[in-house]
């Protein structure tokens, strides 16, 4: 560019183009966290959320409740690490776990629907997976996570495979769950 003004104009054009291309992936341009954005959307819609977490071990609930005022939209949740608690607290049928395994799309859906119903929430999230470093198999490797989001119009489920260590997998699993809510409410 021949001048600072031309360079600035060109930079603004590129920023606009990037924003257009990445709009589905950018949730904030002012530094707000994903949990803040999700809380904002839930409040705008007068909606509530409950979670049933397995491999994330409460990280999702911790992230949501780290935001002041989250009690207006977050009803609570359960860390259902054992199969018995999946059945007892989130109403996952034991037969479903026996048939498909605890780490499955079917169990993620049952977790989301069960916790939504139990807490009488607008939305329920179910997360189950293999955070590692052990416990993986060729069919269900470390990093495999199923996320389900249940609402009054049905339930959607997403399968993801995350790399990295246990904490990284747990973080990305919680990020994916929050992003599912964000996209649903946009």
Give the role of each language-model region:
Residues 6-186:
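Short alpha-helical segments enriched in small residues
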Residues 1-3:
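Short beta-strand-to-loop capping motifs
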């Amino acid at each position: 560019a021949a001048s600072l003004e031309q360079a600035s104009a060109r930079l603004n054009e590129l920023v606009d183009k990037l924003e257009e291309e990445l709009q589905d992936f950018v949730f904030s341009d002012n530094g707000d966290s994903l949990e803040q954005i999700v809380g904002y959307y839930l409040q705008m819609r007068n909606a509530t959320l409950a979670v049933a977490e397995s491999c994330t071990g409460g990280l999702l609930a911790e992230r949501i409740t780290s935001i002041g005022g989250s009690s207006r939209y977050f009803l609570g949740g359960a860390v259902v690490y054992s199969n018995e608690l999946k059945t007892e607290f989130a109403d996952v049928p034991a037969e479903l776990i026996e048939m498909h395994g605890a780490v499955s799309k079917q169990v993620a859906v049952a977790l989301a629907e069960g916790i939504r119903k139990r807490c009488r929430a607008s939305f329920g999230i179910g997360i189950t997976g293999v955070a590692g470093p052990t416990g993986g198999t060729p069919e269900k490797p470390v990093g495999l996570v199923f996320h389900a989001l249940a609402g009054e119009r049905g339930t959607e489920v997403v399968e993801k495979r995350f790399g990295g260590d246990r904490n990284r997998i747990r973080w990305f699993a919680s990020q994916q769950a929050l992003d599912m809510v964000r996209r649903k409410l946009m």
